[in-house]
């Protein structure tokens, strides 16, 4: 049986993917991955590998060599100077060391055509890395009818025909929301493929690379709430075939 996700095809029953999981504790810069990210990758049948944080380019290259995919996790705000903006008074904590590390990871992933999936901050990092910008604080810069940092779920509209829609087999879903920043100007070569009711971008994907990101937290929906539709994001949305 052959099924396709992220514009790529994978044979059912293929060997588990080895997925590098990148996260960092904001207060100590220590490696500190939330259990739900690891559990989502493992429960979907793949093998999670927690990556040590480093800005040593050679070491980053060696770490990514055996991987089949890379997962960029949620966390602090991205340093605004990386997208040519002055810090807003409402900017949250930034972690410049983490920014530098994740940009190095993306350098190497792009070089290898390694599939990359970003969640929350990870989606924002992808957009900034490829030349996009961010809303630094939605409540003050782009107020709308939705509280995007809330315990409440809200709906998202997924663009018909997008890789995300094909992966989730849906065009409307209820998702969680835990962010005060979001994609503002989309990076060249990317398209927005999901939107909140107030127009905030909820997912992006590359036109030419196996790279995508979502603003919500599918790992929590899958692992904590048992939302099986999100399994596919961790099973095959990024696939080994993407780096060929």
Language-model region placement:
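N-terminal beta1-alpha1 cap of cysteine-dependent amidohydrolase-like domains
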Residues: 2-119, 127-129, 135, 139-167, ...
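Catalytic nucleophile loop
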Residues: 123
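A glycine-rich beta-turn/hairpin centered on an aromatic-Pro dipeptide
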Residues: 177
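Conserved catalytic core of two-component histidine kinases
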Residues: 194
């Amino acid at each position: 049986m052959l099924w396709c996700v992220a514009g790529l095809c994978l044979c059912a029953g293929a060997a588990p993917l080895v997925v590098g999981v990148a996260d960092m504790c904001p207060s100590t810069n220590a490696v500190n991955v939330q259990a739900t990210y690891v559990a989502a990758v493992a429960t979907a049948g793949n093998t999670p590998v927690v990556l040590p944080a480093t800005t040593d380019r050679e070491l980053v290259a060696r770490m990514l060599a055996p991987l089949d995919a890379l997962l960029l996790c949620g966390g602090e705000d991205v340093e605004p100077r990386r997208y040519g903006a002055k810090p807003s008074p409402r900017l949250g904590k930034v972690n410049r060391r983490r920014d530098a590390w994740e940009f190095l990871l993306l350098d190497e992933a792009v070089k290898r055509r390694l599939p990359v999936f970003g969640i929350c901050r990870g989606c924002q990092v992808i957009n900034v890395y490829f030349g996009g910008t961010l809303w630094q604080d939605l409540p003050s810069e782009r107020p709308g009818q939705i509280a995007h940092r809330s315990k409440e779920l809200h709906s998202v509209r997924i663009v018909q025909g997008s890789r995300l829609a094909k992966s989730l087999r849906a065009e409307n879903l209820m998702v969680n929301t835990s962010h005060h920043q979001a994609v503002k100007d989309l990076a060249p070569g990317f398209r927005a493929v999901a939107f909140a009711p107030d127009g905030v971008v909820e997912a992006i994907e590359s036109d030419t690379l196996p790279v995508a990101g979502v603003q919500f937290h599918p790992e929590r929906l899958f692992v904590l709430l048992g939302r099986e539709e999100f399994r596919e994001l961790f099973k095959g949305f990024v696939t080994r075939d993407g780096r060929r």
